[in-house]
Amino acid sequence: MPINKSEKPESCDNVKVVVRCRPLNEREKSMCYKQAVSVDEMRGTITVHKTDSSNEPPKTFTFDTVFGPESKQLDVYNLTARPIIDSVLEGYNGTIFAYGQTGTGKTFTMEGVRAIPELRGIIPNSFAHIFGHIAKAEGDTRFLVRVSYLEIYNEEVRDLLGKDQTQRLEVKERPDVGVYIKDLSAYVVNNADDMDRIMTLGHKNRSVGATNMNEHSSRSHAIFTITIECSEKGIDGNMHVRMGKLHLVDLAGSERQAKTGATGQRLKEATKINLSLSTLGNVISALVDGKSTHVPYRNSKLTRLLQDSLGGNSKTMMCANIGPADYNYDETISTLRYANRAKNIKNKARINEDPKDALLRQFQKEIEELKKKLEEGEEISGSDISGSEEDDDEEGEVGEDGEKRKKRRGKKKVSPDKMIEMQAKIDEERKALETKLDMEEEERNKARAELEKREKDLLKAQQEHQSLLEKLSALEKKVIVGGVDLLAKAEEQEKLLEESNMELEERRKRAEQLRRELEEKEQERLDIEEKYTSLQEEAQGKTKKLKKVWTMLMAAKSEMADLQQEHQREIEGLLENIRQLSRELRLQMLIIDNFIPRDYQEMIENYVHWNEDIGEWQLKCVAYTGNNMRKQTPVPDKKEKDPFEVDLSHVYLAYTEESLRQSLMKLERPRTSKGKARPKTGRRKRSAKPETVIDSLLQ
């Protein structure tokens, strides 16, 4: 029995936020930029210095985990992504996404260099982790793993694994499923190598471009989704299905046109990217602000798809990527502020038990039906087995007209062993037929034809049996049995992850011990400072405290000034977007006013409505108007006239001067294109023109 949502255990967790700082790249070194970011991995703090202002105090941010420029890919995975993927394998939804300015290493964190095991990112490492877990599961547990890959390019959702990557897909929502993409292709995978091949295929179709800040800049947001269904026996003895979805999101970076040098198509892409990231920031702000009653999920495709990941049914980890150069000071501060705000988002994740859109139970049911068919044998008609059986399968039935009719019984079941026996019997009868020389030629041909017919039917049954076996094998390949070694090449990667995880645990214990010792020393120092032996020492102590408070005051003032500047920049950006939209709106209104009459404009406005699902205006009942109806209506053939149609053009419907004039005008011969009358024939002569006749009649 499916469990109601209210009965499912919920875990209320905050969004986990980690920060990763990349090292200075070659371009920044050649331009002699200074390092403005300091990372303290033990304390979990990021400190940003403003190098061109010595009076301004540094800004410090604290997060769950921070990674410096020397951090390893395996450490990043084990500390951040491993807990999320373990939760997905238990049946929770999970989301991992990288956020930050363009060129800060988001794609490297998520994907890395797949050819080198030590440099693989979160997505490839998750493949080995998932199938490593399946290989260690119990033998009666069944798994089904499927993947999909999409991108959001210029606010259009595209399928990176479909035949046509430029086709625009629609975002839909259902109460039982939630937000989903209509017609998005998904592929069932059996091992980590299959996943890697599919990801490589989708990555080739992704939109990338070069800017001044990044040669391989992602021009779209990409979401790689892994759906893991698990079927195992519950306490009640019944089989229960759990389904976890893992969304691995690689966001395009926010960018400034002055720094990236984007023009033309790149500028249009940057505008759309910045708008969607701005909406993401607004969603984060609305979720954190307790007073906000509306969360603008629908303002962009990205936030609509991440609706469950931010404040919904999901365990979410956000990796904020920053650059260390003082050149990107403003962008780094902005990213850290958004990340600091996202820490306060609360999600309510629950295990998805017996979901309606699970495929594992459907596959298992089909496998059982196919096995049952194969055990019982194929269905072939009684006449296909043998001549003697054909006589037994027919029995007389007398109808109302007294004539005898034959009724065929049900179909016979033929097992594989029975097929072998039948084949041997057919061979024996063929040999016996060849040895009988005293038979008539007609009887021999008849017997041979009967044997060929039976052999053909037997061959057909064997082919159907083989087809069922192949279908069963294909379905069983899709369903993965727990405890089977599926790692292949990924086994080495899983081993590497395990070793790195053990090493991290030891380092974490040592770091925790050092942190406790450091706190104790700090407390001892404070206690010593509190004990003054003279007024002079007390004055020195008070002066130190005063300096600390003064530093904090200056930091608060600097923070306020930075916030005002950032707010001003956001306002300017929004105003620029408004000006651009206003120009486009004026152009559209000019076209409409010059080509569509005012009455029709009002009619269109009355019958138009906004469709939230596809983000477009739609006209009501447009299917029953214009060309749509003209396509369905058959065009009458002008050459063929209706035999029942009567020409009533010459009949007076009213005896008025105008009707008389019109009826006589029709008698005039048609004129040629030059305006001259056609030559008169000998049969038909008119003494006067119609105008003369009309005038005479009226007089």
From Swiss-Prot:
Cellular component annotations (GO), alphabetically ordered: axon cytoplasm; centriole; centrosome; ciliary tip; cilium; cytoplasm; cytosol; extracellular exosome
CDD domains: KISc_KIF3
InterPro entries attached to this UniProt entry: Kinesin-like_fam, Kinesin_motor_CS, Kinesin_motor_dom, Kinesin_motor_dom_sf, P-loop_NTPase
Cellular compartments annotated: Cytoplasm, Cytoskeleton; Cell projection, Cilium; Cytoplasm, Cytoskeleton, Microtubule organizing center, Centrosome, Centriole
Compositional bias annotation for Acidic residues: 376-400
GO terms of molecular function: ATP binding; ATP hydrolysis activity; microtubule binding; microtubule motor activity; plus-end-directed microtubule motor activity; protein phosphatase binding; small GTPase binding; spectrin binding
Subunit: Heterodimer of KIF3A and KIF3B. Interacts with CIMAP3. Interacts with CLN3. Interacts with DCTN1. Interacts with FLCN. Interacts with AP3B1.
Family matches, as PANTHER family: CHROMOSOME-ASSOCIATED KINESIN KIF4A-RELATED, KINESIN-LIKE PROTEIN
Name of the featured protein: Kinesin-like protein KIF3A
Gene from which this protein is expressed: KIF3A
